[in-house]
Amino acid sequence: MQIFLVGGAVRDQLLQLKVKDRDYVVIAATPDKLLKLGFQQVGKDFPVFIHPQTGDEYALARTERKKGSGHNGFECYAGLDVTLTEDLKRRDLTINAIAQSPQGELIDPYHGLQDIQTKTLRHISTAFSEDPLRVLRVARFAARFYDLGFKIAPETLDLMRSLSSSGELNHLTAERVWQETANALKTNNPQIYFQVLRDCGALPLLFPEIEALFGVPAPKKWHPEIDTGIHTLMVVEQSVKLSDSLAFRFACLVHDLGKALTPKELWPSHKGHGKLGLQLINNLCERLKIPNECRELACLVSEHHTLIHKGLELEADSLITLMDQNDAWRKPERFSQMLQCCVADSKGRTGFEEKDYPSADYIWRAFQVAQLVDVQPIIKQGYQGAEIKAQLKHARIRSVEQYKQKHSV
């Protein structure tokens, strides 16, 4: 029995990145042998075991043969005769197919070290085309390693295009699509993930709502980049500078979906696009089983971002109504995230990247002032039920009116 460290742990060590998970491959062993050593078996499709002390994953060396459609359409063989080279060959990219022995020796049959040096994301063999999930994985790696200068090999991008046009992407489960997308949104360059999906023809299949934004113009005065799809990716890029929250970055991604529904004869104006986008956001979230936290923030941002952009002009009662509609009193953190999404929206425009966006701070300070209003004096005056709520709103409006007088722009 031989054990090798494989995959992402070896790759990240070589890239001098922090190693999160360590996965091992076990050569010439049986499930019974590992169970006797105290390992716990998990997974039904192929033999994976959890180390009793470290919790690391140990998988028996295996080969895979395509027998059906989609990411799970494989038949696995984990016999004693499967070699390390055969096990590494089934992996997606050369940089993920390097193994390390307990003595530190690197085993690199598919030239992953060379591709690390040249910053290339390259498939190992044409078997790459058998697994549609690899389109999303490569796009995610392109986003994750973009800052390091990694690029997708042209021939690998060609295979990704072939996969996109083959119909195989239709067999991916919603959960896997969202898992890869969520992980991509957590990288430093999530916009690259969506750009790669577009470059290989996968975006219209997986995210038709986002694909539909490309080619939709906005007024040049406010959007020098003009194209709404380009603007969307710029906003996603800006989102990274403001928050690492998944819900926040997703809301930035989908804030303008409604612009795709504007009749062409009304272009480049998009009046009411925020509310128009709500159904598209809900459809996308239903289809990919996206968490409610992401959906809720995304819908609020879509519906209210154009109003927030006019925050400096809003009367006190409009500001309090905005806070009421967004449940800011009970969910101040979400309200703050919503305002910051509008910062990303403003800065996600050509030439506006470094420009101030005072509206968010202005509204947030108004909210903090309104929050200080004490309900107890209202209750002591004898108001009850809905009257308390109405009087509290009036008191908050008065406090914001005073704030506006002191901070008039």
UniProtKB/Swiss-Prot annotation:
The residues forming the signal peptide are none
Tell me the cofactor note: Magnesium is required for nucleotidyltransferase activity. Nickel for phosphatase activity.
Q: Which Pfam families match?
A: HD (PF01966), PolyA_pol (PF01743), PolyA_pol_RNAbd (PF12627)
| Chain segments annotated as transmembrane | none
**GO MF term (any one):** tRNA binding
Disulfide-bonded cysteines: none
Q: Which InterPro entries match?
A: CCA_bact, HD/PDEase_dom, HD_domain, NT_sf, PolA_pol_head_dom, PolyA_RNA-bd, tRNA_CCA-adding_enzyme
Which amino acid positions bind CTP, per UniProt?
8, 11, 91, 137, 140
Q: Which UniProt keywords apply?
A: ATP-binding, Hydrolase, Magnesium, Metal-binding, Multifunctional enzyme, Nickel, Nucleotide-binding, Nucleotidyltransferase, RNA repair, RNA-binding, Transferase, tRNA processing
Q: Which cofactor does it need?
A: Mg(2+); Ni(2+)
Nucleotide-binding recorded as keyword: yes
Q: What is known of its domains?
A: Comprises two domains: an N-terminal domain containing the nucleotidyltransferase activity and a C-terminal HD domain associated with both phosphodiesterase and phosphatase activities.
Q: Which family does it belong to?
A: Belongs to the tRNA nucleotidyltransferase/poly(A) polymerase family. Bacterial CCA-adding enzyme type 1 subfamily.
Q: What is this protein's function per UniProt?
A: Catalyzes the addition and repair of the essential 3'-terminal CCA sequence in tRNAs without using a nucleic acid template. Adds these three nucleotides in the order of C, C, and A to the tRNA nucleotide-73, using CTP and ATP as substrates and producing inorganic pyrophosphate. tRNA 3'-terminal CCA addition is required both for tRNA processing and repair. Also involved in tRNA surveillance by mediating tandem CCA addition to generate a CCACCA at the 3' terminus of unstable tRNAs. While stable tRNAs receive only 3'-terminal CCA, unstable tRNAs are marked with CCACCA and rapidly degraded.
HAMAP family on file: CCA_bact_type1 (MF_01261), CCA_bact_type2 (MF_01262)
- Supply any other comment: A single active site specifically recognizes both ATP and CTP and is responsible for their addition.
Annotated protein name in UniProt: Multifunctional CCA protein
Give the source species. Answer: Psychromonas ingrahamii (strain DSM 17664 / CCUG 51855 / 37)
Q: What is the lineage of its organism?
A: Bacteria, Pseudomonadati, Pseudomonadota, Gammaproteobacteria, Alteromonadales
